[in-house]
C-alpha cells in the first residue's frame, strides 16, 4: 500500500487522510502532538517538529512521497531530504513561492501574471517611496509567516505605519508593500499537477473572509462568467507549470469591480 507522508497534523491533514483511504493509500502524518486533528485518526503518526530535520527524516523513511498541510517547513531541510532521495512534492524550489511573498511577486512579475504593484520595505524611509509608487493607503505585509490575516496591515496614519515598520524590521521580519486593490470578491482557483506535467482544475470557488480567516467557501463561485472562470483555471495551471509544482496548489485571486483577476497569494497544499 503506498505511503504518503504529510508534514503537519492539522485539519487539512485530517481531511487528506480521509481522502487517502478511498485511494487505497496510507497517510502518515508528522504531528507535534497526539491531540492534533490528523493524529487523532491516522494509524501512522510520527511525533516531532516540522523544524527538526531528524523528525522530517523519520517521517519520510519508507514513504513514496512527502508533502505538506502547511508551508512552514524550512526549505533548507527539504533540500537535504531531496538530496537523500526523498520525493518532496511540491519541491522546495516551488514551495518557496508560497513561503516568501517577495520571491512570489518577483517570479509572477517575470511570468506576466496579473498582480498588484509592490515594493520591498527595508527601512522606514522606504514608506515614502512606496507611497509615491503604490498610492495611499497601501497594504503592508510580512513577506514570510503571515496567514489568516496575520502579518497584514492597512494603516492610513503615516506615523502609525512608520512605527509598525520599525517594530517589524527590528524583529527581522521581511516586509513588502502592495498596491491596495479595489476588489469585488475573493476567488480561489485550485489545480493539481502530476510529476509528468499533467494538470487538472477544480471549479473556481468564492471565499468569504471574516476577521482575516476563511469562513465560507461557495462552490462554484456564483455568477462567475464562464470565460472568467476558464481564465482563472488556465492562469493557475500556467503558474503551477512555470513554478514546477507537483501536487495541489490554490491561486488566491481578487476579482475587481471591472471583472479583472489579480493574483493575491499562492497556497501549495490542500486548501479549504
What are these regions, as identified by a protein language model?
Residues 259-261:
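Conserved protein kinase catalytic/activation segment
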Residues 151, 155-251, 255-257:
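Internal nucleotide-binding/catalytic subdomain
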Residues 58-59, 107, 129-130, 164-167:
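CheY-like receiver
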Residues 1-103, 110, 125:
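ATP-binding N-terminal substructure of ATP-dependent carboxylate-amine bond-forming enzymes
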Residues 90-152, 158:
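A conserved helix-loop-beta module that forms one wall/lid of the active-site cleft
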Residues 267-272:
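Glycine-rich phosphate/pyrophosphate-binding beta-alpha loops
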Residues 28, 67, 88-89, 116, ...:
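Structural detector of well-ordered beta-strand residues that form the stable sheet scaffold
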Amino acid at each position: 500500500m503506498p505511503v504518503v507522508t504529510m508534514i503537519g497534523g492539522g485539519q487539512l491533514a485530517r481531511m487528506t487522510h480521509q481522502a487517502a483511504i478511498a485511494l487505497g493509500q496510507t497517510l502518515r502524518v508528522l504531528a507535534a502532538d497526539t491531540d492534533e486533528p490528523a493524529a487523532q485518526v491516522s494509524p501512522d503518526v510520527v511525533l516531532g517538529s516540522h523544524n527538526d530535520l531528524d523528525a522530517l527524516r523519520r517521517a519520510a523513511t519508507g514513504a513514496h512521497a512527502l508533502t505538506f498541510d502547511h508551508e512552514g517547513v524550512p526549505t533548507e531541510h527539504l533540500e537535504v531530504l531531496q538530496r537523500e532521495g526523498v520525493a518532496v512534492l511540491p519541491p522546495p524550489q516551488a514551495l518557496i513561492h508560497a513561503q516568501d511573498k517577495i520571491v512570489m511577486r518577483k517570479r509572477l512579475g517575470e511570468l506576466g501574471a496579473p498582480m498588484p504593484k509592490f515594493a520591498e520595505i527595508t527601512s522606514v524611509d522606504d514608506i515614502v517611496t512606496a507611497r509615491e509608487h503604490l498610492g495611499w493607503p497601501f497594504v503592508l505585509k510580512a513577506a514570510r509567516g503571515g496567514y489568516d490575516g496575520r502579518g497584514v496591515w492597512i494603516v492610513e496614519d503615516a506615523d502609525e505605519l512608520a512605527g509598525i515598520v520599525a517594530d517589524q524590521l527590528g524583529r527581522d521580519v521581511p516586509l513588502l508593500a502592495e498596491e491596495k486593490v479595489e476588489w469585488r470578491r475573493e476567488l480561489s482557483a485550485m489545480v493539481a499537477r502530476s510529476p509528468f506535467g499533467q494538470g487538472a482544475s477544480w471549479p473556481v470557488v468564492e471565499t468569504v473572509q471574516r476577521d482575516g480567516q476563511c469562513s465560507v467557501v461557495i462552490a462554484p463561485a456564483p455568477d462567475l462568467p464562464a470565460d472568467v472562470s476558464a481564465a482563472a483555471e488556465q492562469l493557475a495551471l500556467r503558474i503551477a507549470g512555470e513554478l514546477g509544482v507537483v501536487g495541489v496548489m490554490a491561486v488566491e485571486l481578487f476579482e475587481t469591480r471591472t471583472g479583472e483577476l489579480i493574483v493575491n497569494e499562492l497556497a501549495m497544499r490542500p486548501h479549504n
